[in-house]
């Protein structure tokens, strides 16, 4: 698995914590299932740090609401987090997971790629030691990024604020 935690997780956590930032690690449930040793290593290395928190429960949401930003790779959580919560994202530029090796033949930029520079900033894995500067940059630009997120949300999220009224009607249509 080429995810953040499996490739640069420990280095990233150390860089964030060493700069005095609070860090909540919320691994994907597949990471919990497939590579528990990585998480045990993070727990062993950082559990005594007062600003480190590891959350393994997928039902816990409070940390998302309290957070200022998300750090991820190509995970879909970036779209949910940015468009759903209206908060910025820092993307670690790891190689994307490709499920369709012929995707480029379509001549369409994937939404996951298109949205990255609009809802946050991208940092190379080799630049992780400078993650604190990127965090501070994103936090200082939160208002600008939120304006862009709002525009994207209006363009791409249908029935925004009306799902409760529209959703059940559409489900009933499908059931007929």
What residue spans do the PLM features occupy?
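A structural signal for isolated positions on well-ordered beta-strands in alpha/beta enzyme cores
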Residues: 22-24, 53, 90
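Catalytic binding pocket for nucleotide-activated donors in carbohydrate/polymer assembly enzymes
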Residues: 41-49, 74-155
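Short acidic alpha-helix that forms the nucleotide-activated donor recognition element
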Residues: 58-67
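Active-site donor-binding acidic/aromatic loop of nucleotide-activated sugar
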Residues: 50-57
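Short beta-strand/turn micro-motifs composed of small residues
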Residues: 25-27, 72, 93
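Conserved catalytic-core segment of nucleotide-activated headgroup transferases in glycan assembly
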Residues: 1-43, 125, 159
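C-terminal alpha-helical cap of glycosyltransferases
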Residues: 160-176
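Structural motif
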Residues: 22, 68-69
